[in-house]
């Protein structure tokens, strides 16, 4: 059954393995090269290309092109310039929520392994390399909770969502990709740390809204330390944290209002505790929308934190940058923040598709998400891009009352048997980047570009010396061009309303 906007995998398609893939049965038209695991590493003299079109005719379709040496006389040329270097790349990935893990664990072990290998393996898959998790609950948890609901840090403990769902899945992913980076953020502090007003310190007994009691800044920082240490004991390294998910959001099923004035003070305590406990976990401030919820005195939230803290505080080197979401405002805000703090990093840490943006319609979403979520952020200095849930069921769950009831996963699974998968735009845009742009890559410039306003692109040099480019074409006509690295070149066709990711050896 062919569809325009998503492709569907039946359970049988996942029963193949890398050594016995010929036993699989699948409708090839609906899937991305399902009879063999993707192989992003090009041979010498070869370019490897992945192509997706908004009409769904091509979905991560894998081809190769001959890399030729000598003079390139092609009139339509994209020539890279490795001498122009911008930010390094940490990776691309998805949020691993309780709901994602619940659905993954409903799959057969064989099907789950094949799906995770296809998604995360650097050698035999698309090489997704970053994950986002919550510290305590989020709006796709089994219930509202913190890791220390009873007052006193002696009661700190990982809970069922972590021990039975998130940690087992993370361990499976880490077996496939040991270099996976993980960023973690709380949706709320424990309720006993909350007050309704930081001046009166009036207790605030609610999962939603409230402020962190200033008397508990140091205690809450120790809570973060305990979390990082507890995950380390499970063999899981927390690469980075943000102090608060969506600090200007007073809603959701769990939240904590933390304007920049309060986050700055907490970050100072957090960095000091990390330093005291010999943790190298990085800290990304803010973690919310481009428009700062239209609160006037919260504009340029990260810059105000940097200016308030300065550089002379314990653990200052751990405060590396800021994280952004796109539920309000424009990604041009990244240009402004980078101009004011060029020594600080930027990452894009959350976006979702759902009923509000026709999230299951590839013809509606592919070009927009490719432009705004990945290329529009990476070309504005973001060194990582993460989208929200990797997997939800087709009923948009499991989820919590008060949280998002209208979100889709990057992948949707049919809860009737947990064997039928539907892939949405967020899966494609992340894997179009991760398949060719590897952790540690550096974004580079161009010397010559085609005179075509419908093309948007980004170029990289990987740690292994291979080059990569990702090109999107929003026009209604195919574009044939030559990609040139100054020594070698190859031909590349970018289909109308399509994306091509290329990686090649010098």
Which residues are covered by each model-predicted region?
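Feature marks short, surface-exposed loop/turn motifs that line or immediately flank catalytic pockets
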Residues: 25, 137-139, 190-191, 247, ...
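Bacterial N-terminal signal peptides that target proteins for export
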Residues: 1-10
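Short, compositionally biased low-complexity segments
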Residues: 23-28, 81-93, 140-146, 395-410
């Amino acid at each position: 059954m062919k569809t325009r906007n998503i492709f569907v995998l039946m359970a049988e398609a996942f029963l193949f393995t890398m050594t016995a893939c010929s036993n699989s049965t699948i409708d090839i038209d609906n899937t991305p090269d399902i009879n063999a695991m993707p192989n992003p590493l090009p041979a010498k003299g070869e370019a490897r290309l992945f192509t997706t079109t908004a009409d769904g005719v091509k979905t991560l379709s894998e081809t190769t092109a001959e890399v030729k040496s000598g003079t390139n006389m092609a009139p339509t040329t994209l020539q890279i310039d490795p001498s122009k270097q911008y930010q390094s790349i940490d990776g691309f990935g998805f949020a691993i929520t309780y709901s994602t893990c619940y659905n993954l664990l409903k799959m057969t072990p064989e099907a789950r392994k094949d799906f995770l290998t296809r998604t995360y393996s650097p050698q035999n898959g698309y090489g997704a390399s970053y994950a986002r998790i919550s510290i305590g609950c989020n709006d796709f948890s089994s219930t509202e909770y913190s890791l220390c609901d009873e007052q006193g840090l002696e009661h700190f403990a990982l809970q069922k969502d972590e021990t039975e769902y998130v940690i087992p899945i993370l361990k499976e992913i880490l077996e496939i990709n040991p270099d996976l980076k993980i960023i973690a953020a709380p949706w709320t502090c424990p309720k006993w740390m909350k007050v309704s007003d930081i001046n009166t310190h009036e207790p605030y007994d609610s999962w939603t809204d409230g402020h962190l009691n200033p008397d508990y800044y140091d205690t809450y920082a120790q809570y973060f330390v305990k979390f990082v240490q507890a995950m380390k004991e499970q063999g899981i390294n927390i690469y980075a944290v943000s102090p608060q998910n969506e600090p200007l959001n007073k809603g959701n099923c769990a939240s904590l209002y933390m304007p920049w004035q309060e986050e700055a003070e907490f970050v100072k305590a957090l960095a000091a505790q990390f330093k005291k406990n010999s943790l190298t976990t990085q800290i990304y401030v803010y973690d919310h929308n481009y428009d700062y919820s239209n609160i006037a005195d919260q504009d340029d939230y990260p810059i105000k934190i940097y200016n308030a803290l300065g550089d002379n505080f314990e653990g200052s080197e751990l405060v590396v940058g800021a994280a952004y979401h796109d539920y309000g405002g424009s990604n041009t805000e990244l240009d402004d923040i980078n101009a004011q703090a060029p020594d600080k990093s930027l990452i894009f840490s959350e976006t979702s598709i759902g009923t509000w943006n026709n999230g299951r319609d590839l013809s509606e979403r592919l070009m927009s998400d490719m432009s705004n979520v990945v290329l529009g952020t990476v070309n504005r200095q973001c060194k990582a891009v993460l989208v929200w849930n990797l997997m939800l069921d087709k009923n948009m769950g499991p989820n919590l009352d008060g949280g998002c009831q209208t979100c889709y996963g990057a992948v949707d699974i049919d809860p009737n048997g947990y064997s039928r998968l539907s892939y949405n735009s967020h899966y494609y845009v992340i894997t179009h980047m991760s398949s060719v742009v590897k952790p540690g890559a550096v974004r580079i410039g161009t010397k010559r570009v085609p005179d075509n306003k419908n093309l948007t692109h980004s170029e990289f040099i990987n740690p292994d010396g291979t080059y990569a480019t990702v090109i999107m074409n929003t026009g209604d006509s195919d574009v044939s061009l030559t990609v040139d690295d100054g020594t070698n070149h190859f031909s590349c066709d970018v289909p109308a309303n399509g994306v091509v990711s290329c990686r090649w050896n010098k």
